[in-house]
Swiss-Prot record:
This is ADP-ribosyl cyclase/cyclic ADP-ribose hydrolase 1. ATP inhibits the cADPR hydrolyzing activity. The gene is CD38. Its main location: other. It comes from Macaca fascicularis. The keyword Endoplasmic reticulum does not apply. InterPro entries: ADP-ribosyl_cyclase. Residues 1-21 are cytoplasmic.
Amino acid sequence: MANCEFSPVSGDKPCCRLSRRAQVCLGVCLLVLLILVVVVAVVLPRWRQQWSGSGTTSRFPETVLARCVKYTEVHPEMRHVDCQSVWDAFKGAFISKYPCNITEEDYQPLVKLGTQTVPCNKTLLWSRIKDLAHQFTQVQRDMFTLEDMLLGYLADDLTWCGEFNTFEINYQSCPDWRKDCSNNPVSVFWKTVSRRFAETACGVVHVMLNGSRSKIFDKNSTFGSVEVHNLQPEKVQALEAWVIHGGREDSRDLCQDPTIKELESIISKRNIRFFCKNIYRPDKFLQCVKNPEDSSCLSGI
């Protein structure tokens, strides 16, 4: 006990006192411990796992709310929708949850709030040819892609994810579906709403496919892995594929492509009829949608 000096004591008084050197050492240790606690308390909550994908789109909450308000103003049938409730449900699907463990169930409250019905024969699916599909529905106003519906419109071209066990949105990085995980907030959202969109389709459903790709029908696309398998045979009489050619000189019959035949087989096995049409000139196709009575539209497009 080299650091203790004994002296007569009574009662509960300490039997020894620390030397000045030991007191200084103890004080320094306590100070270092306090600094470490402060550093951990400040830095740890700010630490974020680095994902391979880009972070949440800037001003994500404001963008979603603004889009919701705009959509409900333009579409009278959706004016009953409370956009704050929509945002709360959207946020609740991913905030504080591990970004690689999101489920379709997480999005069900949002799906219920955004329920819409597309008239029969008016559903347009698409795969790898988004821009032309949207140009088409802008002209043919009585047909609808998923992005023409409330939920698809809210999330179109946006990225989002949260921080596990916090209420923060991660604007630095989000999981990439190839490099990190497929059960991320964005991928699961589109899988969920695409499934619902296909389930509610009826009559003749159309799909626009990109004929310039090596796989015109890709089983791994959202259309090939989700929508095709969720068309309801009791409601859908036929699927009509529009294969869009990539150039004026391409005169091939792409409806005979092996991947299109694969699509036909999948659809036929589900007791849904299948039709296919080549669209050789997409520019003329859109022009003829605008002006169907034009004499040039009487010839093939």
